[in-house]
Amino acid sequence: MSASDRNLMIAGGVFHPPEACVPSVTALLQEQGIETDVEEDVEAACQRLAQGGYRLLTISALRWRMDDPKYEAHRQRWALALSESARQAITGHLRAGGALLALHTASLCFDDWPQWSEILGGRWVWGQSGHAPFDQVEVRFDPAAPHRLTEGLTDFSCPDEVYERLWLAPDVQPLAHARNMRAKEGQPGDWAPVLWTRQWEGARVVYDALGHDAQSLDHPVHRQLIERAAAWALGRG
């Protein structure tokens, strides 16, 4: 197996156990010839990343400083301030030609590292961003933003969370929007951007804000979207 076929996936975190998403993501990537190693320990994962051998880094984790008092009960187990060596491992991976596939909670991660939102092209803003309860969501692809990721895909609906009011970098062009279909007293919520691509210092980056669990990740259209996202990030075909 060549390095181009290998993926390192960082998963897990409070309220988002890895078993909710890891099997779905690793299975669909394996079908594309991409073998995945999974780590829940972020620092250990970044040590592995720094050693090389991975072309794709997938973040499907929920790890941040947890400064808000309401997270006090979870802080000892789950709070994370990313070390300088871990930051260098991620940027080193990208500068060496590696790719990044960021899923769902990745926009909440590493809130003590400003460069992360620059790499990702967006971030969760505490006190501003939010989401309605997990429910049926409607996803629409933007015909005004054609891209290999979305070409020929049909709009779809599935159970998920829609992250609203994220900060987006000025140059980000969303490829899809979604809304919770019962967010406002049974009425649909606001449309929010949920998918975009980006290049950071030559590295290809994809962020897919959907994917709370297998009910979303196993939807046929969403599966195809993630397959294409990985292929595009790796520069395949």
Locate each region found by the language model:
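A glycine-rich, often tryptophan-bearing local segment used as a flexible ligand/cofactor-contacting loop or short
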Residues: 64-152
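Aromatic-Pro/Gly-enriched surface loop or interdomain linker
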Residues: 1-55
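Short beta-strand/turn micro-motifs composed of small residues
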Residues: 11, 104, 178
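A glycine-centered loop/beta-turn motif at secondary-structure junctions
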Residues: 5-7, 31, 57, 167-237
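Short, structured active-site "lid" loops
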Residues: 52-70
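Solvent-exposed loop/turn segments at secondary-structure junctions
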Residues: 14-15, 43-44, 63-66, 106-110, ...
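Catalytic beta-strand/loop cores that center a nucleophilic Ser/Cys/Thr
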Residues: 29, 118, 122-201
